[in-house]
Amino acid sequence: MSKVEDDFMKKAPKDVEDLWRFIDEIPYWTAKKHGKKYRLMYQIYTHPKYRQYGKKFFEGVNERYTEYAKSLEPKLGIPYEKLTPLIFILIRACVHYALFEDEFYLKSQIEVLKETLELFVMKYNPKYNPNINS
C-alpha cells in the first residue's frame, strides 16, 4: 500500500489555495485509481487469520500520516497536531467512498472537513484571506 500512499502524497496541496482543489478531487481520484486495492486490502485485513497484519499496517499508517501532516504544516500554517486528525477524516472518507461509492457519506465528511479547515486557516494563518473557500 505504500505505492497508494506515495501517489496520494504526490497530489498533496502546495498551499492553502490548492487545499480546496485537493479535497474536492482526491476522493474521486482515489476511488478510480486505487479502489480495487482498497477492497482487496479490507477483505484480507478483516479476516481473522490476517487481522494482526492489518493492525501492524495501520500502526505504520498513523506514523506516516503524522509525518505527512508535519510536511504540510509550513505550507498551510496549521499545526501538524491539528492536521493529523483531519487527514485521518479525509482518508477515511476517501476509502469509504472507494469501497462503497457512498456519495452522502463522502459529501457530509468533506463539508465538515472544509469548514474545519477554514476555521483553522483563519486561526493559525490569519494573513490568508478569510474568504478562502468562495
For each predicted feature, which ranges?
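Hydrophobic recognition helices of helix-based DNA-binding modules
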Residues: M1-F8, T30, Y65, I91-A98, ...
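Helix-loop "lid/cap" segments that line or gate small-molecule binding pockets
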Residues: D24-K32, R39-K49, F120
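Amphipathic alpha-helical packing segments from all-alpha helical-bundle domains
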Residues: W29, K33-K36, K49-G77, E81-P85, ...
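Hydrophobic alpha-helical connector segments
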Residues: K3-K33, I87, I110
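Secondary-structure edge/capping motif, primarily at the C-terminal ends of alpha-helices
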Residues: F8-K11, Y38-P48, A98-D102
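Hydrophobic/aromatic-rich alpha-helical bundle segments in the mid-to-C-terminal region
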Residues: E59, L72-F120, Y124-S134
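Generic alpha-helical structural signal
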Residues: S2, W20-D24, E59-N62, T66, ...
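Short, hydrophobic secondary-structure boundary micro-motifs
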Residues: Y38-M41, Y53-G54, K107, P130
